[in-house]
Regions:
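Short helix-capping/linker turns of helical repeat alpha-solenoids
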Residues: 27, 39-44, 57-60, 73-75, ...
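Bacterial N-terminal signal peptides that target proteins for export
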Residues: 1-11
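Hydrophobic face of amphipathic alpha-helices that form TPR/SEL1-like repeat modules
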Residues: 31-39, 51-55, 66-73, 102-109, ...
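Cleaved targeting-peptide boundary
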Residues: 23-32
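C-terminal segment of classical bacterial N-terminal signal peptides
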Residues: 15-23
Length: 219
């Protein structure tokens, strides 16, 4: 699954940058990293790439994720999925949750690497177990579809719930849908309506539609 740029940016800033101040950087590399962030805010991705490259080469996982994102989306550098995978892998192997999510997506889609659902699930799971909501959603979806794992509606619901409780709108919709259909959980229209409402409030249009139908007694 290719995530919108805004989603990977959110994942990076929400998880990778959480460790920013604890990283053992001297003043100059830290300033260099910050200058890269400021460059992206101006739309100057080439400058950001040049600033982050030496940090990534020195083994900084956050910079590695950002380089992977740059290569994946052609931001300041020629688009190259193989290079994106290389940098995501380096960060993922250091335990970066955003990188694990992205590496899983590259395996699921077969971009820059041979398509492999089992390998995708491996990386989604590592990110999900660190509490990354988008990875928890993805794990729920692969259990729902039986991609790389044995199809299991109960496991799908378990992961939807974890992501939903962290505020992921699509997971909230999927959890509501599971309650509506009784997939992996007992039918409960009241709870379905509750989760559809939360999804709607978080911008998931399908949640609004289903909430309205339940409210009008059409389902």
């Amino acid at each position: 699954m290719k995530f919108p740029k805004t989603l990977i940016t959110t994942a990076i800033l929400g998880f990778s940058l959480a460790s920013f101040h604890s990283t053992a950087w001297a003043g100059t590399p830290e300033q260099q990293f910050q200058q890269g962030l400021e460059a992206t805010e101006r739309g100057d991705y080439q400058t950001a790439f040049k600033l982050w490259l030496p940090l990534a080469e020195q083994g900084d996982a956050i910079a590695q994720v950002l380089l992977g994102n740059a290569y994946e989306n052609g931001l300041g550098v020629k688009q190259d999925d193989v290079e994106a995978v290389k940098w995501y892998r380096q960060a993922a192997e250091q335990g970066d949750a955003a990188a694990q999510l992205k590496l899983g997506a590259m395996y699921e889609d077969g971009r820059g690497v041979k398509q492999d659902d089992v390998e995708a699930v491996k990386w989604y799971r590592q990110a999900a177990e660190q509490g990354l909501a988008l990875a928890q959603l993805q794990l729920g979806l692969v259990y729902n579809k039986g991609l790389g794992v044995k199809q299991d509606d109960v496991e799908a619901v378990r992961w939807y719930r974890q992501a939903a409780e962290r505020g992921d709108a699509q997971a909230q919709f999927m959890l509501g849908f599971s309650y509506l259909l009784g997939k992996g959980i007992q039918v409960n229209k009241s709870l379905a309506k509750e989760w559809f409402g939360k999804a709607c409030n978080n911008g998931e249009q399908r949640g609004c539609e289903y909430y309205g139908k339940l409210n009008r007694g059409e389902m």
